[in-house]
Each structure stands twice: as C-alpha cells, then as structure tokens.
C-alpha cells in the first residue's frame, strides 16, 4: 500500500511568505573596499615629497624607485589592518583592495604575510597616470555594476577626502581611514562578530 504524505495545512501564499521572511532575515552581503597606503599600510618610509605649483605632492618617480621588495617588506600595518583581517574572515563579506599603487608580487606577498589577502585587488597599471580619485571611481564603478554586486552594501575606506568624495554616488558608506586610524575605532554597525 502506498501512503501519501499528509497535506500541509499551510497555504501556498503563507509558505511563500515564510520563504520571503527567511530570505530577508539573511544578512545582506557586504563589500568592504580598502585603500592601502595611509589606510591599512604605513609606507611613509618610502615616500619622497616635492613641491609642485605650491602644493606638496608625492614624487611618483622616487616612489617607484623605492618600491623594492626589501622596502615593501619594511612597511608597517595601521590599526585598520586588524579590521580588514576580521572582514576577510567574516561571513557574507567580500574584501577588495582598491589602490593607486601598481601592485607587484612583493605587495601581494606582504598582504599574505599579514593575513590580509583580499578577494580582489584593483590597482593602477604600470603606465597609467590617471588621478587617484578618477582611477578608483572607474575601477570600482565597473565592478559594482555587475549583477552579483548590485545589491551588496558597500563600505569604502580611504585616507584621501578627494577619493571619498569621488565615490559618494557609488558607495553606501565612505569612511575616512585617517580618522579611524587616529582613534582606533570602527563604527559599531560594521562589527564583524
């Protein structure tokens, strides 16, 4: 004799409502985007400053020359690096690096050595001299338009106000890394535990 399973006393619309509630109770996927220099990493020992049109700027030629493996490995971590590591280990998160650096294997090795390997690295191409804020907006904007990332909450950490301003229309929350590193605290709503 074949027995039929008992009929559910729950209506289809009620079951659909339960599925909807369960899906909406799931934590929303977050994308944490970190700049590197003066955000997560202190590489100031490699920086040579110069005056250009009355403004103090980074000498990019000297920077490139000083970006040897030996010097990169002398960089140190800033307080925000601890939070980046927590984000990497957390569920429902992607961690991206978006840097104006031209990333070398030594840069990737440095991140790995400190447990800071992100899901994705966006970086400057070798001969690209696009202004940082334009470059970052372009790189991040292309990816956030892809379907898997459209509904994610985005949190961007950078030390330069010009970069934060450029990404205002793309990012849910722009956070000044310099201020966070100075006070050593992350806003409570992004605690990963």
Language-model region placement:
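Acidic active-site catalytic centers that drive phospho-/nucleotidyl reactions
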Residues: 18, 35-37, 158-159
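Active-site-adjacent beta-strand anchor residues
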Residues: 10, 97-100, 157
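Alpha-helical substrate-recognition element adjacent to the catalytic core
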Residues: 27-130
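C-terminal cap/substrate-recognition subdomain and adjoining C-terminal extension
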Residues: 27, 31, 102-193
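Short, small-residue-biased leader/transition segments that mark boundaries at the very start
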Residues: 4-20
